[in-house]
Amino acid sequence: MKAMILSAGRGLRLMPVTKNTPKPLVKVGKQTLLERNITLLYQSGITEIIVNGSWLGEQIESFISNIQLEGLKLHYLYEGSEPLGTAGAIYNAMDCNLLLNENFWLVNSDIITDFSLPNISLLNNRVGHLILVPNPEHNPNGDFGLRSDQVLNESVEMLTFSGISFLSCRMFDETTERSSSLVDIFRDKINHNLISGELFLGEWLDVGTVKRLNRAHNTFGKN
């Protein structure tokens, strides 16, 4: 099974921490965010991981070149000085034949979680499965609703997208703009009842700002 870690973001909300360090290589405790997510995927049985990069991408490339985990293949895709966006990154991986006609896990590089990847089958022509979490302080209105295992664009009770999803390459066809945001693509597919999901209640933190990075140090800094 393959996975991709989205790692090309500029990390402006983490300045000045990210002035000379790309966001995925920011450390929480003894480990970088990227290392934590590679370990998470590897321990869940992932055997091939694609990591994209842009800002200070040479540091990311050097970092993953030194990771040695038995049975794991790591690929680095440099996107140039301007990131391709969340959907563009996936199209780029498909163009490079690193993602073919298959299903794969997609993880944001700036989250910390103890989520364990389940075995998922995309049934009834669905093209994606989203992991949702209770709304954190910084996103009180949530992103999506959930009825049974069906993700909704609107609901009385909204939840937050965790940055973890299980996707089919069928989601990214010729009808979709490469410059689209991944969330916009999700919303379109949700309108056609093509996205399932589940609620995760374990440890999860989006390390997107200096304030939340400090919280991560307090919560996860010992490991």
Map each language-model feature to its residues.
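N-terminal glycine-rich phosphate-binding loop and ensuing alpha1 helix
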Residues: 1-60
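Residues at the starts of beta-strands that form the adenosine-phosphate
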Residues: 2, 47-49, 73, 103, ...
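Short beta->alpha linker loops
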Residues: 29, 55, 81, 202, ...
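Alpha-helical elements of Rossmann-like donor-binding domains used by nucleotide-donor carbohydrate transfer enzymes
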Residues: 36, 40, 59, 89-92, ...
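Conserved beta-strand termini and adjacent loop/short-helix elements that scaffold enzyme active sites
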Residues: 54, 77-79, 131, 154, ...
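Conserved beta-loop-beta/alpha segment of the NTase-like Rossmann-fold superfamily
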Residues: 66-142, 146-148
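Catalytic-core segments of class I nucleotidyltransferases/pyrophosphorylases
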Residues: 105, 112, 118-122, 135-138, ...
